[in-house]
Design a protein with these regions (language model features):
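Transmembrane beta-barrel domains of Gram-negative outer membranes and organellar outer membranes
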Residues: 28-287
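Cleavable N-terminal export/targeting peptides
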Residues: 1-35, 207-212
Length: 287
């Protein structure tokens, strides 16, 4: 009887140990699961990139954007190249490189590269209607003295919500600290997207794991309307507590397999204004 009890206890202990280890091992295996280029959720809702908010979903995409802002006789142009690269299904990185030039009353007053930003990120929650990604933006002082030369970090989160009927919401929240100026601010944004069109099955492959057509460039031909609000609030210094907001109304379109085009109108929502109006446009290449 004693031997039987001992054997039973050993088996129970082994079972408990396996159970305790299985959860973290399963989580680790999920992070190392191979990347799968998906543009639709498990229930068929399109994943759409907002203009000024990092996505919660992972991908392999190249963005080439140009933004123009004007106010008080000063015009600022910013061209930016951004690469989003997923290493696995849940781990990835974003790299951003801007180039800025200004003119006043039509006369060039300065130009140069902005700072390089590197953003390691991990998809932490992934459900049919909600995604949450944690990230750590690191800004390196690689830009010109006029438009860069700062070191900063910005830990934050990005979220994606499926609101139903092809309405989606991209949102983000981060705390950015600039070391050179010893300044800290809360950075935030929300982007509402309404998608129109029909998913083409010409470029889809069935994912048997979920029984949905979700593969690669299934969003070619879809049209999207964007409404966005982004902003920042200083957490220290003379401007502590001020709210600085800007809005965007834009559209994007799946021009071809692996290529989206987009454009938007920018406007300030709070005073004092940093600019009077602005325009942005660009291309998204999906790999």
């Amino acid at each position: 009887v004693i031997r039987f009890i001992r054997r039973a206890m050993k088996r129970i202990a082994s079972a408990l140990a396996i159970t305790a280890l299985s959860a973290p091992l399963a989580a680790a295996s999920d992070f190392l699961e191979p990347f799968e280029h998906i543009h639709l959720s498990k229930i068929g809702t399109p994943y759409v990139h907002s203009f000024g908010i990092e996505p919660a979903f992972t991908g392999r995409d190249l963005f080439i954007d140009h933004t123009y802002r004007v106010g008080d006789g000063v015009a600022e142009h910013e061209s930016e190249i951004e690469l989003e690269w997923a290493f696995t299904k849940q781990l990835g990185m974003i790299v951003e490189v801007p180039y800025v030039w200004e003119d006043e009353e039509g006369v060039a007053t300065g130009s140069g590269f902005g700072d390089l930003a590197i953003v390691p990120r991990a998809l932490l929650i992934d459900t049919d209607r909600f995604m949450l990604t944690g990230q750590m933006e690191v800004v390196l002082p690689t830009g010109s003295s006029r438009f860069g030369g700062e070191t900063a970090i910005a830990p934050g989160v990005s979220m994606w919500n499926d609101l139903g009927n092809w309405w989606t919401l991209n949102s983000g929240l981060a705390i950015e600290h600039a070391f050179d100026e010893d300044s800290t601010e809360l950075v935030y944004g929300v982007g509402l997207v309404k998608s129109f069109g029909k998913v083409s099955t010409d470029h889809c492959e069935e994912n048997h794991d979920h029984d949905h057509h979700r593969h690669v460039h299934a969003t070619a031909g879809l049209f999207h309307v964007h409404l966005e609000v982004t902003g920042a609030t200083p957490l220290n210094g003379a401007d502590k507590g001020d709210v600085n907001l800007e809005g965007l109304v834009g559209v994007s379109y799946g021009l071809a397999v692996g290529l989206d085009i987009r454009a938007g109108y920018l406007f300030p929502l709070t005073t004092p204004r940093d600019f009077d109006k602005g325009f942005t446009g660009g291309l998204i290449f999906h790999f």
